[in-house]
């Protein structure tokens, strides 16, 4: 019983330490400024104009939408 108590105690302490540590694991793309627009996040069928606009609004921009930055690259979410 003593070994089990110690094992459970160490497990719970480890869980507490891991859960209380700050985790900044969210990856973000480098923002590029193109013609006065802040462009980031590649647009897809899931990440469309609406979600791009919502992200721009939550970042403090008045609006945003998906733009083709160059013909050889995919559309990017650009805030303006």
Swiss-Prot record:
Database matches in Pfam families: Defensin (PF24552)
Domain of life: Eukaryota
Signal peptide start and end residues: 1-27
GO cellular component, one term: extracellular region
Keyword Signal attributed: yes
InterPro entries: Defensin-like_dom
Subcellular location: Secreted
Keyword Hydrolase: no
Single GO BP term: defense response to fungus
Disulfide topology: 39-79, 43-66, 52-77, 56-78
Keywords tagged on the record: Antimicrobial, Disulfide bond, Fungicide, Plant defense, Secreted, Signal
Protein family (similarity comment): Belongs to the DEFL family.
Protein name listed in UniProt: Defensin-like protein 51
Species of the source: Arabidopsis thaliana
